[in-house]
Amino acid sequence: MAKQSMKARDVKRVKLAEKFYAQRVELKRIISDVNSSDEERWDAVLKLQTLPRDSSPSRQRNRCSQTGRPHGVLRKFGLSRIKVREAAMRGEIPGLKKASW
């Protein structure tokens, strides 16, 4: 199990990313627009740098929804490989069965 503080930190990052999403997209649009003046683009870069670091979506970590495990998480289920296997063996995931050939 992951520490509660690590789970809480990830939740905080998700909320911050949602809060600053529109602002971040607008600034990135200005930066990548070739029709913007160099001064406008530079101002946008500086404003983007002043945003909180944790508001960037790339700082979020995929974690298991049950255990908080950061590695081996299957996006389709939102669970770690261990919990997916346990649930599949109990028949709790419809349509998923153990491979046999």
UniProtKB/Swiss-Prot annotation:
- Name the residue ranges with Polar residues bias: 52-68
Q: Which UniProt keywords apply?
A: Ribonucleoprotein, Ribosomal protein, RNA-binding, rRNA-binding
Q: Can you cite an annotated GO cellular component?
A: cytoplasm
Residue numbers spanned by region Disordered: 51-70
Q: Which one of the record's GO molecular function terms can you name?
A: rRNA binding
The record ties this protein, via InterPro entries, to: Ribosomal_uS14, Ribosomal_uS14_bac/plastid, Ribosomal_uS14_CS
The record's section on Pfam families has: Ribosomal_S14
Any single GO BP term: translation
Per the record, the similarity remark reads: Belongs to the universal ribosomal protein uS14 family.
Summarize the subunit comment.
Part of the 30S ribosomal subunit. Contacts proteins S3 and S10.
Described by its record, this protein's role is as follows: Binds 16S rRNA, required for the assembly of 30S particles and may also be responsible for determining the conformation of the 16S rRNA at the A site.
Task: Report what the protein is called.
Answer: Small ribosomal subunit protein uS14
User: Which organism is this entry from?
Assistant: Mannheimia succiniciproducens (strain KCTC 0769BP / MBEL55E)
